[in-house]
């Protein structure tokens, strides 16, 4: 049976529980332990698939097609472990399962209640991860903040969980905040004390405290927290604000987090191997020349909507010894002001995924600009569909061409609905989701970047390239460099004669890892680097042509 670690959070939301869980996973894996991490989300949605990116941020897609919280992306990237739909649990999915069981008569006419039925379902979900993941340690992050009404069933479930396993098979970690009060010139422990008191009132005594702070925590404060909160002094772990999320595992290792957890779980503290991770952080802190990358999107007001895209760009920059100079460009602003003013000076352009018509014309204009100005371009999902529409309108003479999603009366639906989607009514969980194979055409840029003939990529879409336009597309100078194995679905396209112009129907950002960047992102950054000035004179010239009004954030 695996060991179980539960991570809760107090005082404020967005305190970093996900990064703590992912970092602990990385530290345990560096000692030879298999780890699986799951997230318990307290919202009533069955999954985040139908939620607005402005409310929830990115929807991360697992190999088996689950639409999950963005924290699962952190878990996968830090542990380099593929997770499944078992690793994402919401209040909505719990209630849905319990109600379905009640309708089937599984409860033999009993009164169905939060306790024991809801909490039992939650516990079963956690045990299921342990039984199906081959993990030595299962880490569970509980979403929300201690004290929230929504989180109470989950907290009660993990309290009950202690009765399911042995005393040495479970550990509770509480992430809290030590705010600095400028007028008094000191860090305050009272919010942490009250948060732990709230957790204790539920019946959970934390074994370790991760104390977030923007400045060092001295021994006197640690002793005070230890005394008031009932934890060992060594179990009060400072977690100072970090320059990068990838430096957090190293910082927590230095503070003894993994050693304390292993001691609580009665596991051997094997030799830790973090050499590659340390090299990664060193390269991140000591980058080469910067590359300006514009992300042209429709949800740029909330950067978390494109979290995996940003991390994939960062991984590629680390690998290529480059510094990422990221510019958020609102697609609708391009519609108002034009591409030239907003994109001049960019070394690469990424057009990520999305849904609906808002901002699409701005994305298409950005793609046209990248094509004509020979600026490296990478399109993802909707970004590929926009690249096809741009081709049809500007190179094939099909002025009214668009996607069937955007205009069902268009005479030229160069992007149309997948056949299997024709009769789909529900929105949630019904797209083409999860991993599918892609066969690459030999001697194409895509095949050279991957170095493989067949690759497996994660998808999330309802619409596809319309094969009625395939021959015209190829005759116009484009190459279809990747398709489904049967050749029916267009997965990857590229433009001949362009330094780097490629787009894919899938989401390569979900497979990028620190130290193992995705080939398409790595290729994009390499192409961007080829544009960098090679001499002081060229650098001056590049500075002069950059727009003086260029902003890093154009919401």
Curated annotation (Swiss-Prot):
Keywords: ATP-binding, Glutamine amidotransferase, Ligase, Magnesium, Metal-binding, Nucleotide-binding, Pyrimidine biosynthesis. Its EC number is 6.3.4.2. Residues 540-555 have a biased composition (Polar residues). Allosterically activated by GTP, when glutamine is the substrate; GTP has no effect on the reaction when ammonia is the substrate. The allosteric effector GTP functions by stabilizing the protein conformation that binds the tetrahedral intermediate(s) formed during glutamine hydrolysis. Inhibited by the product CTP, via allosteric rather than competitive inhibition. Residues 532-555 are annotated as: Disordered. Residues 1-267 are annotated as: Amidoligase domain. L-glutamine binds at residues 354, 382-385, 405, 462. Pathway: Pyrimidine metabolism; CTP biosynthesis via de novo pathway; CTP from UDP: step 2/2. The active site is at residues 381, 507, 509. ATP binds at residues 14-19, 71. One of its GO terms (molecular function) is ATP binding. GO terms for biological process: 'de novo' CTP biosynthetic process; pyrimidine nucleobase biosynthetic process. Mg(2+) binds at residues 71, 141. InterPro entries: Class_I_gatase-like (IPR029062), CTP_synthase (IPR004468), CTP_synthase_N (IPR017456), GATASE (IPR017926), GATase1_CTP_Synthase (IPR033828), P-loop_NTPase (IPR027417). GO terms for cellular component: cytosol. Residues 292-534 form the Glutamine amidotransferase type-1 domain. UTP binds at residues 13, 188-193, 224. PANTHER family: CTP SYNTHASE, CTP SYNTHASE-RELATED. HAMAP family: PyrG (MF_01227). Belongs to the CTP synthase family. CTPSs have evolved a hybrid strategy for distinguishing between UTP and CTP. The overlapping regions of the product feedback inhibitory and substrate sites recognize a common feature in both compounds, the triphosphate moiety. To differentiate isosteric substrate and product pyrimidine rings, an additional pocket far from the expected kinase/ligase catalytic site, specifically recognizes the cytosine and ribose portions of the product inhibitor. Homotetramer. This is CTP synthase. It comes from Prochlorococcus marinus (strain MIT 9211). The lineage of its organism: Bacteria, Bacillati, Cyanobacteriota, Cyanophyceae, Synechococcales.
């Amino acid at each position: 049976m695996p060991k179980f670690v539960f991570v809760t959070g107090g005082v404020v939301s967005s305190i970093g529980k996900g990064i703590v869980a992912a970092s602990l996973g990385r530290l345990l894996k560096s000692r030879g332990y298999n780890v699986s991490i799951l997230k318990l989300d307290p919202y009533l949605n069955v999954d985040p698939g139908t939620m607005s990116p402005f409310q929830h941020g990115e929807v991360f897609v697992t190999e088996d097609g689950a639409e999950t919280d963005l924290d699962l992306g952190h878990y996968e990237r830090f542990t380099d472990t593929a997770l499944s739909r078992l690793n994402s649990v919401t209040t909505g999915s719990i209630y849905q399962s319990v109600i379905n069981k009640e309708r089937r008569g599984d409860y033999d006419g009993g009164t169905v209640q939060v306790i024991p039925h809801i909490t039992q379902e939650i516990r079963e979900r956690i045990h299921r991860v342990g039984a199906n993941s081959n993990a030595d340690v299962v880490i569970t992050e509980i979403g929300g903040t201690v004290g929230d009404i929504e989180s109470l069933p989950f907290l009660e479930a993990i309290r009950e969980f202690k009765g399911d396993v042995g005393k040495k098979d479970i550990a509770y970690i509480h992430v809290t905040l030590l705010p600095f009060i400028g007028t008094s010139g000191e860090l305050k422990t009272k919010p942490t004390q009250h948060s732990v008191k709230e957790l204790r009132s539920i019946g959970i005594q934390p074994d370790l405290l991760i104390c977030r702070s923007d400045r060092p925590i001295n021994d006197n404060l640690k002793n005070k927290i230890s005394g008031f909160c009932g934890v060992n002094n060594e179990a009060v772990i400072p977690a100072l604000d970090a320059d990068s999320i990838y430096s957090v595992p190293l910082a927590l290792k230095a503070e003894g987090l993994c050693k304390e957890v292993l001691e609580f779980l009665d596991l051997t503290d094997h030799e830790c191997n973090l050499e590659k991770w340390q090299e990664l952080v060193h390269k991140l802190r000591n980058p080469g020349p910067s590359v300006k990358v514009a992300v042209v999107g429709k949800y740029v007001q909330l950067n978390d909507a494109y979290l995996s895209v940003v991390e994939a760009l960062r991984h590629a920059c680390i690998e290529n010894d480059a510094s990422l100079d990221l510019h958020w460009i609102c697609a609708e602003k391009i519609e108002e002001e034009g591409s030239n003013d907003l994109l001049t000076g960019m070394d690469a352009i990424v057009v990520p995924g999305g849904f609906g018509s808002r901002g699409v014309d701005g994305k298409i204009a950005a793609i046209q600009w990248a094509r004509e100005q020979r600026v490296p371009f990478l399109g993802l999902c909707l970004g590929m569909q926009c690249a096809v529409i741009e081709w049809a309108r500007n190179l094939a003479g099909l002025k009214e061409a668009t996607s069937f999603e955007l205009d069902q009366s268009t005479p030229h639906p160069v992007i149309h609905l997948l056949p299997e989607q024709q009769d789909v009514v529900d929105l949630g969980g019904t797209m083409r989701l999860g991993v599918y194979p892609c066969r690459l055409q030999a001697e194409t840029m895509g095949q050279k970047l991957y170095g493989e003939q067949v690759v497996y990529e994660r998808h999330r879409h309802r619409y596809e390239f319309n094969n009625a336009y395939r021959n015209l597309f190829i005759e116009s100078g484009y190459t279809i460099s990747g398709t489904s194995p049967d050749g029916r679905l267009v997965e990857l396209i590229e433009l001949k004669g362009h330094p780097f112009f490629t787009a894919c129907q899938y989401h390569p950002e979900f497979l990028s890892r620190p130290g193992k960047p995705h080939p398409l992102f790595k290729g994009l950054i390499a192409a961007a680097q080829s544009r960098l000035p090679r001499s002081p004179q060229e650098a001056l010239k590049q500075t002069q042509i950059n727009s003086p009004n260029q902003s890093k954030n154009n919401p």
